[in-house]
Design a protein with these regions (language model features):
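Conserved GNAT-fold acetyl-CoA-binding loop/helix
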Residues: 22-40
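A short beta-loop-alpha structural element at the N-terminal edge
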Residues: 1-16
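Conserved beta-strand in the GNAT
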Residues: 53, 59-69
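A short helix-loop-beta-strand connector motif used in the catalytic cores of GNAT acetyltransferases and
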Residues: 41-53
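Alpha-helical elements of Rossmann-like donor-binding domains used by nucleotide-donor carbohydrate transfer enzymes
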Residues: 13-20, 39, 96, 100, ...
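Conserved catalytic-core motifs of GNAT/GCN5-like acyltransferases
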Residues: 116-118, 134-144
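A conserved beta-turn-beta hairpin within the catalytic core of GNAT-like acetyltransferases
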Residues: 70-81, 136
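Acyl-donor binding region in acyl/amide transferases
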Residues: 79-126
């Protein structure tokens, strides 16, 4: 598996794989493939956006999107995960994405990394705790 920051040409080449990945994603939210491709293009060249693709045997098997912002009351830079998708059955790749994101966050001088997931699992919880992440509050969602 190869994790890398995509170029415009990579996104064009991997758009069919990206659409397939989004369509096969099994989660509580149903992402729009077209909007995911647009988000990838918008991330290019933006120093405050982190985007990485994971490719295995020429197929896109996952992507990670994150961003940099400032905490309102402390002024500290924070790196926040925006979206992570992996094809079903592609276990073990979250850790590689986390390593890349942490390196980028340090380079950006972020003080904290915030991660959130639409769905949680015991395995994911163990991975996050083992890597030094601690639960920080609770997220709620309501369809309107």
């Amino acid at each position: 598996m190869n994790i890398f920051e995509p170029t415009d040409a990579d996104i064009r080449l991997l758009t069919p794989s990206l659409r397939r990945l989004v369509q096969e994603y099994r989660g509580s939210l149903t992402p729009d493939p077209v909007l995911c491709v647009r988000a990838a293009y918008r991330a290019l060249g933006n120093p405050n956006i982190f985007i990485r693709f994971a490719v295995k045997d020429g197929e896109l098997i996952g992507f990670f999107l994150g961003g940099l912002s400032v905490e309102m009351f402390t002024g500290a830079k924070i790196a926040t995960q925006i979206g992570v998708m992996l094809l079903p059955g592609q276990t073990g790749h979250l850790q590689a994405f986390l390593n890349e994101f942490k390196t980028w966050a340090k380079e950006q001088r972020a003080k904290r990394i915030y991660m959130h997931f639409a769905e949680s699992s015991e395995r994911q919880d163990k991975i996050m705790k083992r890597r030094g992440y601690a639960p920080a509050g609770t997220h709620y969602m309501k369809e309107i």
